[in-house]
Regions:
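Short, intrinsically disordered, mixed-charge
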Residues: 24, 31-34, 61-65
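Short glycine-/aliphatic-rich beta-strand segments at the starts of folded cytosolic domains
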Residues: 1-17
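Dynamic helix-loop-helix/coil hinge segments at AAA+ ATPase domain boundaries and subdomain interfaces
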Residues: 99-106
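Conserved residues at beta->alpha junctions
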Residues: 9, 20, 50
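Interdomain "pre-motor" coupling segment immediately N-terminal to P-loop NTPase/helicase cores
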Residues: 38-99
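Short amphipathic alpha-helix segments
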Residues: 13-31
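A generic structural signal for short, non-catalytic loop/turn and secondary-structure boundary residues
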Residues: 1-3, 30, 95
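Compact, well-ordered interaction domains used in eukaryotic information-processing assemblies
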Residues: 27, 33-36, 40-42
Length: 106
């Protein structure tokens, strides 16, 4: 399988959101998809097998979309993006535009 890096061009705000404080968000993505996430400037570089890169790319794009809307990205947002990428869910991190769905307990 190809382990060549794939570069995704992102805004500075989106790249910072994907990396997270102390690279915490990047580490979550790396662990979830067995890829290497690097932020050399101007975007994100993903290195790993093709399936891992494809899923990580979906998560990165979902996080970047929210960051570009001016929304703060927290660890919960990253975990939701990872879950959606794994399950093949498309679109924003949740149907109502929030980070997490609201349960019956509100």
């Amino acid at each position: 399988l190809s382990r060549a890096p794939e570069f995704i061009t992102l805004s500075d705000a989106a790249a910072r959101a994907v990396a997270g404080a102390q690279s915490r968000h990047a580490a979550l993505i790396e662990d979830a998809f067995d890829v290497l996430v690097e932020t050399p400037g101007g975007g994100v570089s993903l290195t790993g097998d093709s399936k891992g890169r494809a899923q990580a790319k979906k998560a990165v794009q979902a996080i970047a979309e929210r960051a570009d809307q001016g929304l703060d990205i927290g660890e919960a947002d990253v975990r939701v993006a990872i879950g959606n990428a794994r399950s093949g869910a498309a679109g924003p991190l949740s149907a109502n535009g929030g980070a997490l769905p609201v349960g019956l307990r509100g």
